[in-house]
């Protein structure tokens, strides 16, 4: 699948077949995702793969703040990835002599790049994904056994899509999102 086609066709998938995605395929997806760029190549993204139905049910009940829409998607998903990042590594260089004003949040930027890379790779391999942001990071970290030096960035449900691929949604025109400053 061509990169431009993959970007244009990837959609959030919320309905999955009752079919487990193999650990081998998940390993392939995460191996490609490990190439996502990060601040000074700090590679802070971590992927905790959960395909145990009991743990997914716990995340559904305790980890999405009662948001029914996400609860239903989780209940239907054969797997979920807890995307986390190692805290305190991104946003600064050379013992903090050089840093961005966004040091306290650059890890989320790196996690976002890793998340998109994961979702595009999964799509290229025939696996649908949906990224959740309405989450209880503390509850999810506890359920997933995330180390204390990491923070949860997002949940990503995954599985083989059931039914027809979601139709494209409208996009803002380039004129609405692009500025050109010439002076």
Range-by-range predicted roles:
Residues 29, 33, 96-143:
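Small-aliphatic-rich amphipathic alpha-helix that forms the alpha element of a beta-alpha
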Residues 41-111:
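Glycine/small-residue-rich phosphate/adenosyl-binding loop
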Residues 85, 134, 160:
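Short secondary-structure boundary segments
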Residues 71-77, 146-167:
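A glycine-rich helix N-cap at a beta->alpha junction
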Residues 7, 29-33, 81, 156:
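Short alpha-helical scaffolding segments that buttress acidic/His motifs in well-ordered protein cores
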Residues 3-13, 17-18, 89, 154-183:
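C-terminal helix-cap and adjacent tail motif
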